Swiss-Prot record:
Subcellular location: Cell inner membrane
Protein name: Phosphate import ATP-binding protein PstB
Class of enzymatic activity (EC top level): translocase
Taxonomic source organism: Roseobacter denitrificans (strain ATCC 33942 / OCh 114) (Erythrobacter sp. (strain OCh 114))
Gene: pstB
A cellular component annotation (GO) from this entry: plasma membrane
SMART domains from the UniProt entry: AAA
Top-rank taxon: Bacteria
Family to which the UniProt record says this protein belongs: Belongs to the ABC transporter superfamily. Phosphate importer (TC 3.A.1.7) family.
Gene3D superfamilies xrefs: P-loop containing nucleotide triphosphate hydrolases
Amino acid sequence: MNDMRILERDVDAKAIKISARDVQVFYGDNHAIKDVNVEIQDKTVTAFIGPSGCGKSTFLRCLNRMNDTIDVCRVQGRITIDGEDIYDKRVDPVQLRAKVGMVFQKPNPFPKSIYDNVAYGPRIHGLAQNKAELDNLVENSLRRAALWGEVKDRLGAPGTGLSGGQQQRLCIARAVATQPEVLLMDEPCSALDPIATAQVEELIDDLRQNYSVVIVTHSMQQAARVSQKTAFFHLGNLVEYGETGTIFTNPEDPRTESYITGRIG
């Protein structure tokens, strides 16, 4: 673990953005998530780590109701964002996903121009009143994704023609274009080379100035580099949650220590 650069920052005073209480998830008869209780702070990067199949991605998808799209999946318990129960029947999942953006494992740009990839969400949600406002929103989103300088002269080119790392940053720009408050990232660097990974990791650190960022990662080194809080999942349970530096250097639960040191996983 000596090769890890542990980022430890004071986030204790930050407000709670997301709260989960007694959350359980079932896929048919399979009990995938078991009584998860956690509070995720605002403008903080929170990493979910754990072995494959531990439930970290399943729980991540609960935070913007992506599991609603799976017929056999049912979610129990209570999840709130800014105190609002996101599973309340009055909540529109489409509007929720504008507020809680998501970036997936593999870059998935739409088969549209770079401009139209970013403009898609604002058009759907009516966030721009005219072309000038939309142009400004697209530019600001690409700037936030650290991509503007690379694409500003070819906004009409296909998004699929960009490199893998650029495509993932385009997907991040597309996510922030709907003016979300939370960004969920499910293994966002797993398909990228080391240089592109470093660019996205630097971007994640910048994004937390404006958003709550929750990232699922199999890389403990990545979790240590980018996050201030870390949650360790194992067999559907949230085993331990705390400051990233503490989780990696002085965990309380033996299962966490076993995972960090490579004895389980």
